[in-house]
Amino acid sequence: MSLLQFSGLFVVWLLCTLFIATLTWFEFRRVRFNFNVFFSLLFLLTFFFGFPLTSVLVFRFDVGVAPPEILLQALLSAGCFYAVYYVTYKTRLRKRVADVPRRPLFTMNRVETNLTWVILMGIALVSVGIFFMHNGFLLFRLNSYSQIFSSEVSGVALKRFFYFFIPAMLVVYFLRQDSKAWLFFLVSTVAFGLLTYMIVGGTRANIIIAFAIFLFIGIIRGWISLWMLAAAGVLGIVGMFWLALKRYGMNVSGDEAFYTFLYLTRDTFSPWENLALLLQNYDNIDFQGLAPIVRDFYVFIPSWLWPGRPSMVLNSANYFTWEVLNNHSGLAISPTLIGSLVVMGGALFIPLGAIVVGLIIKWFDWLYELGNREPNRYKAAILHSFCFGAIFNMIVLAREGLDSFVSRVVFFIVVFGACLMIAKLLYWLFESAGLIHKRTKSSLRTQVEG
């Protein structure tokens, strides 16, 4: 890449970054937080944060990258995607009408809410316990990270339930919403994330997500400033780099350490070059249609229920890894959101996907606002926990693609909804057995005086 070519790419990158950052800033000034702000920051991180890192790798370490015209296509496709997404998100689908009382879909009380977070936490802890009994601490047993996907590791399906510890702790926080509950959320979820990091053998997702939710709650409540958020972001990048070194068993120093930091940080936070690789091989892609979305559900079907279930699922990530990169190491390389759309239907699917994503984020913001307006604090805690708990799925959306997002968000909704139903059933059983005693003002006054 020549300096002239780099200059052209830099101008396009700068314009796209300023365009998205400006719209995000105006939205932040208007509402302080919603899921459009979160997704916009996540989109910036995924598709534009990596460009400076790639540039340093090219000019400092002479690393090979896709041709400049392909990198230009990647930047422009990301910018156009966001423009279509933003217009879709801001388009009002129906006339604003005055709020009229409606019969609520469901209600929550104190006991049901506490039962819900206990069940969610129980699912996570029991899953971790069973996985640990089968495999021990994989971080200290395995020689390479790719081995966690091998037949040596049993009970892999249990990992999908680990994440429900975070929604459980979110319910606990939203019931109190003070600084102590905020700090308790951080300590408990990061401690759980470090435990799963050691047990699973290097998975950092729970730590990243817990830290991100902690920061956004702090921004919403005014407990941290934007400068503190930026400093925490830098600290998070350094922390993820250190965990990656431990995961891969790397011991580096000097120029090698700087080089390793650049490419690991790029691959962890901003795999935008993967989109460029897909565009470079565009003519060789056999478009998969909507099949990757259907196939991604296969991993949630137990083998005893479907004996002939394919052991290897050809979703967009695996198609990119196996067919485009010819990589059969056992790891799935993230194709990114736009890359998954390219695998499914080529360039035509990019604006269509942007419209779908705009509607998805719009739905989450509708739920979030519903929680903000809800007078029942127990129901509000459940709604907010669901919305913030889905942040993991939004990260999957940006990094892994639309197919992975759909299967995971459906799984999340089913498990979360099942926990709600079980909590309500248990409450009904306890109440029928006479074990539930409603609090009254007189009893509370007696307790205080005693």
Swiss-Prot record:
One of its GO terms (molecular function) is polysaccharide binding. One of its GO terms (cellular component) is plasma membrane. Pathway: Bacterial outer membrane biogenesis; enterobacterial common antigen biosynthesis. GO terms for biological process: enterobacterial common antigen biosynthetic process. The chain crosses the membrane at residues 6-26, 37-57, 63-83, 118-138, 155-175, 181-201, 207-227, 228-248, 341-361, 378-398, 410-430. It holds the Pfam family WzyE. Keywords: Cell inner membrane, Cell membrane, Membrane, Transmembrane, Transmembrane helix. It comes from the Bacteria. Its main location: membrane. The keyword Cell division does not apply. Belongs to the WzyE family. This is Probable ECA polymerase. It comes from Escherichia coli (strain K12).
